[in-house]
Design a protein with these regions (language model features):
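N-terminal helicase ATP-binding lobe
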Residues: 1-264
Length: 264
């Protein structure tokens, strides 16, 4: 076998790597000076494979937490959803009733609360808010870590809750989509997880998607860049100038993704 050097093909750092290393399923000498046959996750300190190792560990920890909360192993579809989340991807849960969309979302919010990370659960009705909070208590989330709003709150109690909201004194926020519409300016930014139950009703109110993105830490400018990229990509006939703009906007979006990315 003739030894070759492949430029920018190291699966971990994107640098140069020899054909011998690739044949053995290893990374380059820079990432791993000494060849090992054991699990690479035990040796690598940085890079894309290191990130995948961390994600795999995070998914396994969530799986154990889910089983403890629900009493059974998560479905393969729920594991796929968890993988998408820990890969920092936004997505819609498209599945029939009873598959476990709500159990997935609430177990993930409870799991993140253990790590001091904040979640916002948006529901269509107050009744579902109460049911959700009760379920979160059952998952082991302490009462003082959950903030929710109901129609039975007394004036003093509601004002105290609003102060907690403004100060960010919670780990899980559970409200209706109408509450989001009315109190958007009072809700702090920078949530780690945003879970919308019954997204159809959520989309009936204009600009809810924009508000959700802003709550996750994106700016109006970020959203405008994404919309412009979508508009250009949807054009049937693109000029060279269009392609140049698309490439420039795509690079900006990559930078925004890195800026807003979360490490677990």
């Amino acid at each position: 076998l003739i030894k070759s050097i492949f430029k920018n093909l190291c699966p971990n750092c994107g640098g140069d790597i020899s054909s011998e290393r690739l044949y053995k399923g290893l990374v380059c000498e820079k990432c791993l000076p000494i060849e090992v046959v054991e699990d690479l996750c035990d040796e690598l300190k940085y890079g894309r494979i290191r990130l995948l190792c961390d994600i795999r560990k995070e998914i396994d920890n969530w799986r154990k937490f889910f089983k403890k909360c629900v009493g059974s192993e998560p479905w393969s579809l729920q594991l796929t959803w968890a993988m998408r989340f820990f890969l920092d991807r936004s997505f819609a849960l498209l599945a029939p009733t009873g598959v476990g969309k709500t159990s997935f979302g609430l177990s993930l919010a409870a799991y993140l609360a253990q790590k001091g990370k904040k979640s916002y659960v948006i529901l269509p009705t107050r009744l579902l808010v109460y049911q959700t909070v009760k379920k979160l208590y059952g998952f082991g989330v302490a009462e003082d870590k959950i903030l929710f709003f109901g129609e039975e709150d007394r004036k003093e109690e509601r004002e105290a809750k609003l102060n907690r909201l403004r100060n960010g004194d919670f780990l899980i926020l559970a409200t209706t989509s109408m509450f989001l519409y009315k109190h958007y300016q009072e809700i702090p930014r920078g949530f780690d997880f945003l879970f919308v139950d019954d997204v159809d009703s959520f989309l009936k109110t204009a600009r809810n998607i924009d508000k959700a993105l802003l709550l996750l830490g994106f700016s109006e400018s970020d959203i405008s860049i994404a919309l412009e990229a979508i508009r250009l990509q949807s054009k049937l006939y693109k000029t060279e100038e269009d392609w140049n703009k698309i490439n420039a906007l795509t690079e900006k979006l990559r930078e925004l993704r890195r800026k807003n990315g979360r490490a677990f």
